[in-house]
Amino acid sequence: MVLEFGKGAFVVDDLRNVTIKIGEIAEEEEEWAPMGPTPMPGIATLRDWDFFLLKRYKPFYAPACDMCCLCTMGKCDLTGNKRGACGIDLAAQTGRIVTIACSIGVSAHTGHARHMLHDIEHMTGKKLSEIPVDLGPEIDEVAPLTELITGIKPKTLEDLERALRYAEEQIVQVVDAVHTGQEGSYLDYESKALHLGMLDSLGKEIADIAQICAFGYPKGEDNQPLIEVGMGVMDRSKAMILVIGHHAPPVLNIADYIEENGLEDEVDLGGICCTANDMTRYYQKAKIVSALGRQLKVIRAGLADVIVIDEQCIRADILYHTKKLGIPVICTNEKAMHALPDMTKEEPKNIIKYLLDGNPGCVILDPLKVGEVAVEVARARRKQRGDDIGPRLTEEQFMEYARACTQCGNCTIACPQGIRIGEAMEAAENGDRSKLEKEWDVCIACGRCEQVCPKGIPIIDMYNYAAWNLIVNEKGKLRRGRGPIRDSEIRNVGAPIVLGTIPGIIAVIGCGNYPNGTRDAYTIMDEFASRNYIVVTTGCMAFDAALYKDEEGQTVYEKYHDRFDGGGVVQIGSCVANAHIHGAAIKVARIFAKRNIRANYEEIADYILNRVGACGVAWGAYSQKAASIATGFNRLGIPAVVGPHGSKYRRAFLGRPYNDEDWMVYDARTGEKVRIEPAPQDLLVAAETIEEAIPLMAKLCFRPNDTTQGRSIKLTHYIDLSLKYLKRMPDDWHLFVRTEADLPLAKKEELLKELEDKHGWKIDWQKKKIVEGPIRGYHAGFNPTNLERCLRDGFMTV
């Protein structure tokens, strides 16, 4: 037998009874950039980087429970450094629980991405290979996370699917590690959690780029139109469809059906959570009713004629409430079917009749059938109920319930906000409903109070009745989600961000589990945008900030531009659009510093940690997705602040400013180790109040690479915000002074005097120079890195 190879073919002589199968044909990768050291990293690939972060930012644990109840050898008491039956201690068990939470979060986003690709093929009738990844002429770095993590620069959605397969495989491997009898080190559990956080960012990018390219969402253009937001924006003269969840394709079919049949004047489409955000990127007449924190208030207000749910952040007891109100529910996703009958294969007319016959709901898993059913059911129900849309309680019922309250205090004990509901009920009984109305916004509508009330008072309905005028008049304005940051924008702001003259990027993201109502979201955005920070925002916090107006009647979205530039408020989109915030930081390294981002995660994360002044805030974070989102930011070198409820995630990453060895970096210019200021000081930290959080966020934008001008600007804001919100100078401001040129010019003499008197620094008053005192001096050529490899081999550039 002779085997001959020729160009493009091979020939085999005398071959019999052989079947030849040709599988996937791999085309040669285009070498647009050198392949970096870590394409498609496994669990252990970036472990050294994780361990560096975990050494500097030591995990601080606050376990919610000292027991482990995960296997039948337990339950095991882990207090007092005891080990469980399997040998695990409390630190490792807490790290394990954190890893489990992150695995749930990353599975939600990655599962969403997989479902998105399936629905795109079904709804468009195209193969993934036929849909190009095209984000317009101003975006060449179309998928910076995908390129950074996998080494793939996608040309079609099929390329994104390859990256998604990698993420899915890695998630399985990490979840395997949380099984009993596997990992035993809290450090390695945290490394695995960081790995999941990175995969979460990848899954989000795949999901959002896919829907942008398939459904024609905005591609990073600024000056986006304003969308109505608030419980008062729904037109009560029309049939009302309420959508809840995060997976938009079924809702897009509703929008198509409304438009194709000319029903815009008859049907109003509104939503809660990320589905609401994404549908407005497709259908501009859609409205955002509320963020997650008001979901139960919206449902119980009875505004909707039909409710359509898909996946994530949907109340598990939604049918319990809708059955009482007679509102049918259509489940469109197999992850949330609520024991309803699957009618996917039924004709739409049969499904419509079934729902109008008074049945509580059904499942429709074909997104192309949802539009007709939802719209026609809503139209029919609107005719049935007429104009009877108002509070669910009568005046007599309201007063009867107010009088029934015995001030037992059970509700306050159950309330995560500690609201003194009984006092508000007593005031209402005496004719003062202002307390209930004021607390309506602080209440996150969890419903726990109703579960413990011995009198069965419908407390949510009481709140809605007292605040009804507020509800019907609540109308704000939100910029439509614009999607990714354009390369052209990065070219303009890369230098100011790295040098510090734009003091930082503030990412306002996450859920609505706020400690004191929704106004905090507005306060954070307005404060930082007014100081020339770049404010980017997504999800529920983006919605809630839109509900408030300044003295001139403008929301933050009307007051500030939406370019990625100083003083901008940029509404990126839904939860999965958070990936574009990661992407912006990566693009700074790629476009401004000319670093090679292809499969080069560790080096780019090192660059961001040392140079890109960015800080995330998830003030109302509640979900496992929020945990994996924050952990993904952390692995990339971006710190995050959470609200007081965020301590329930059980873990913080706190720096120790006093520990010299934690703050040693290499100066690539000289090869020597240098002790730097604690910048950024923490990687994940909970703040108790908004007054504590705002100065903390400004502090977490300090970076070792700041120029003197940039450091002076950042110190000005840090000191000013501390004086404004905490009424005192920050205790640690002097740690960030390297030279007198770092000091805010307007307070230079005052601060030099304080450095001399309070901190013992030596000052040459004749020259007004610092002679002795700083942790380190300033050198314009300082080139910080934490990676020995980069000292040895140099930085990868393109």
Swiss-Prot record:
Question: Can you tell me which residues bind [Ni-4Fe-4S] cluster?
Answer: H246, C274, C313, C511, C540, C575
Q: Where does [4Fe-4S] cluster 4 bind?
A: C415, C443, C446, C449
Keywords recorded for this protein, A-Z = 4Fe-4S, Iron, Iron-sulfur, Metal-binding, Nickel, Oxidoreductase, Repeat
Q: What class of enzyme is it?
A: oxidoreductase
User: What superkingdom does the record give?
Assistant: Archaea
Which residues are listed for CO binding in this entry?
H109
Q: Which cofactor does it need?
A: [4Fe-4S] cluster; [Ni-4Fe-4S] cluster
The record's CDD domains line, in alphabetical order, gives: ACS_1
The GO annotation for biological process reads: acetyl-CoA metabolic process; generation of precursor metabolites and energy; response to hydrogen peroxide
Catalyzed chemical reaction(s): CO + 2 oxidized [2Fe-2S]-[ferredoxin] + H2O = 2 reduced [2Fe-2S]-[ferredoxin] + CO2 + 2 H(+)
| Subunit and interaction comment | Heterotetramer of two alpha and two epsilon subunits. The ACDS complex is made up of alpha, epsilon, beta, gamma and delta subunits with a probable stoichiometry of (alpha(2)epsilon(2))(4)-beta(8)-(gamma(1)delta(1))(8).
UniProt-recorded name of the protein: Acetyl-CoA decarbonylase/synthase complex subunit alpha 2
Source organism phylogeny:
Archaea, Methanobacteriati, Methanobacteriota, Archaeoglobi, Archaeoglobales
Q: Which gene encodes it?
A: cdhA2
